[in-house]
């Protein structure tokens, strides 16, 4: 399977195929004729896939370096980015060379941020190995690092030269790491793909069901992401639908401490919480929040956050990128499979944090 992303100023393809990681070197050689490549990865993924990718690239004649950092959301910082800049400079990486992001969402966001800012931008590729990265963060060109104030507070828009997705890599994930990716998959079904929602309804929620259906749910998710990115590359309109559940979700991630609550888990809680309040305000049809709750519960996603503190969460989300002056934009669902953006006074977000 292949998904084409044809943007006005940059086009690339997303290759989705079981077992395609074993052909990554050949894939890269058809996209790049560069002399030097730095693979950016984390300590977990390096052990699983680092040596294989290095060997594949060397067989194609590339000079290869590897930068690995401690796995986890806590590493997605300007401090780690600065270490990578130093590594690239030490190895005399230039704008004619390239970066490959090998790993999950943290790796992809951080590596893409570095690539887009080092020497004002060098080329990069994404090889995502987690479900969250395969269905969401590796696609669309958003890069970013976290700060103590907010998630992804510092970032850029930069498109990769290609994305290689091998669903087989999901088999090396722990159960929690696999399940958290379903938060984003469920979101796609809710905002724009009723067929995907029906696929999820037919699944029994087990780990095996996720792995067995991986190719289909990744493809559907990539198609939804592609549609929104093509229509709104810089997140000014339609693409904002992809933020459903994220305003509250990101606040939960910051409040819990980066890495304590995984991204897809926080999104699941955020979707449920926002929908319940939106229903009470008659902004959404009754029953959708229960549908979301049931779907998240079926796949083993958390449906509540034990350390809920509405005042602290409000303070955090007031720094959200979707806030503008005294207003903030939220995403609501007129029906299953459809989304719209609704602007409210920032202060009204306190209502959406009421349990």
Curated annotation (Swiss-Prot):
Does the record carry Lyase as a key word? yes
| Pathway this chain belongs to | Metabolic intermediate biosynthesis; chorismate biosynthesis; chorismate from D-erythrose 4-phosphate and phosphoenolpyruvate: step 2/7
What are the required cofactors? NAD(+); Co(2+); Zn(2+)
Positions annotated to bind NAD(+): 105-109, 129-130, 142, 151, 169-172
Q: Name a GO molecular-function annotation.
A: metal ion binding
Quote the EC number: 4.2.3.4
What are the recorded Gene Ontology BP terms? amino acid biosynthetic process; aromatic amino acid family biosynthetic process; chorismate biosynthetic process
Record's Gene Ontology CC terms? cytoplasm
Q: Kindly state what the record says about how the cofactor is bound.
A: Binds 1 divalent metal cation per subunit. Can use either Co(2+) or Zn(2+).
Query: Could you tell me the superkingdom of the organism this chain comes from?
Result: Bacteria
Q: Tell me the Gene3D superfamilies matching this sequence.
A: 3.40.50.1970, Dehydroquinate synthase-like - alpha domain
Fetch the InterPro entries from UniProt: Dehydroquinate_synthase (IPR050071), DHQ_synth_AroB (IPR016037), DHQ_synth_fam (IPR030963), DHQS/DOIS_N (IPR030960), DHQS_C (IPR056179)
Catalysed transformations (reactions): 7-phospho-2-dehydro-3-deoxy-D-arabino-heptonate = 3-dehydroquinate + phosphate
Extract the HAMAP family matched here: DHQ_synthase
Q: Which family does it belong to?
A: Belongs to the sugar phosphate cyclases superfamily. Dehydroquinate synthase family.
Q: What does this protein do?
A: Catalyzes the conversion of 3-deoxy-D-arabino-heptulosonate 7-phosphate (DAHP) to dehydroquinate (DHQ).
Protein name from the UniProt record: 3-dehydroquinate synthase
Species of origin reads: Streptococcus agalactiae serotype III (strain NEM316)
């Amino acid at each position: 399977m292949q998904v084409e992303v044809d943007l006005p100023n940059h086009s690339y393809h997303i290759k989705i195929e079981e077992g395609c990681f074993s052909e990554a070197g050949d894939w890269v050689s058809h996209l790049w004729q560069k002399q030097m490549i730095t693979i950016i990865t984390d300590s977990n993924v390096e052990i699983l896939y680092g040596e294989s990718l290095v060997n594949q690239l060397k067989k194609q004649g590339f000079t290869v370096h590897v930068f690995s950092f401690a796995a986890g959301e806590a590493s997605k910082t300007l401090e780690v980015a600065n270490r990578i800049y130093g590594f690239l400079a030490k190895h005399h990486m230039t704008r004619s060379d390239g970066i490959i992001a090998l790993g999950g969402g943290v790796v992809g966001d951080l590596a893409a941020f570095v690539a887009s800012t080092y020497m004002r931008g060098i080329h990069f590729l994404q090889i995502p190995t987690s479900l969250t990265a395969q269905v969401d963060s590796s696609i669309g060109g958003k890069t970013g690092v976290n700060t103590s104030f907010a998630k992804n507070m510092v970032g850029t828009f930069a498109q990769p030269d290609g994305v290689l997705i091998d669903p087989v890599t999901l088999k090396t994930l722990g159960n929690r790491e696999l399940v958290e990716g379903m938060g984003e998959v469920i979101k796609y079904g809710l905002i724009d793909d009723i067929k995907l929602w029906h696929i999820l309804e037919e699944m029994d929620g087990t780990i095996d069901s996720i792995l067995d259906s991986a190719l289909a749910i990744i493809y559907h998710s990539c198609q939804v992401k592609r549609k929104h990115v093509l229509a709104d590359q810089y997140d000014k309109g339609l693409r904002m639908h992809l933020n459903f559940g994220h305003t509250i979700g990101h606040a939960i991630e910051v409040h819990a401490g980066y890495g304590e609550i995984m991204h897809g888990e926080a999104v699941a809680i955020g979707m449920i919480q926002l929908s319940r309040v939106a229903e009470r305000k008659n902004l959404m049809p009754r029953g959708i929040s229960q549908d979301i709750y049931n779907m998240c519960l079926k796949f083993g996603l958390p449906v509540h956050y034990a350390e809920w503190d509405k005042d602290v969460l409000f303070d955090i989300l007031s720094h959200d990128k979707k806030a503008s002056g005294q207003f903030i934009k939220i995403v609501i669902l007129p029906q299953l499979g459809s989304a719209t953006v609704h602007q409210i006074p920032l202060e009204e977000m306190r209502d959406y944090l009421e349990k």
